[in-house]
Amino acid sequence: MGKARTSASGLIKRDTNPAPALRSETAEKILDVAERLIQTRGCSAFSYQDIADALKIKKASIHYHFESKTDLVIAVIDRYSERFDEALKNITRDESATSMAMLERYVEPYAAFAATPDRVCLCGALSGEMPALPRAARERVAFFFKSHQQWLTQILKRGAARGDFNLAESAAKIARLFFGALQGALLIQRTTGDSSQLKDVISALKSQLRK
């Protein structure tokens, strides 16, 4: 991994090469299907044939855009992480927003995942397969988790300083609890089919911050 730097959203980011040229429509569709398959089945449980069947294209077309499955998975993770990072930048850009409002916007993607019972966070899904993932993928998944916990820490500190939150523990510890609870709630909902799981977890977390 490259040297870390701080982004505008308060996350630590890797130094990367200049962004690649825009992908073709076919490449984006391949990434869309691969992302959905990872979120619903897991990385090891899908193949290029599954994507080819879904898009009604030949496997050779997929290999043209992504030579190996590792290349594809890395591209999926990078695109997913970039979208999240842009969302976090948009949240922190509004300095007039309360810290609770920022957290409520943060959990919106999780609520969207929960609306599709068999779907979880991409990096949450991949974390269950860490030993089998290529090193580059493992590093990216770990980075996603760490950077989101750091972002949450900064929002919690902001809320405590402004009197929005009453933290019983350090902001860093609460951030770990918050992030872990969201990820865990999605996995438990998928396992049990309990559609209230995430909603109840978010409600409890918000109540703890207001005490």
Where are these regions (language model features)?
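Hydrophobic alpha-helical connector segments
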Residues: A75, R79, K89-R119, A171-F178
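Amphipathic C-terminal alpha-helical segment
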Residues: F113-T116, Q154, R158, F178-S196, ...
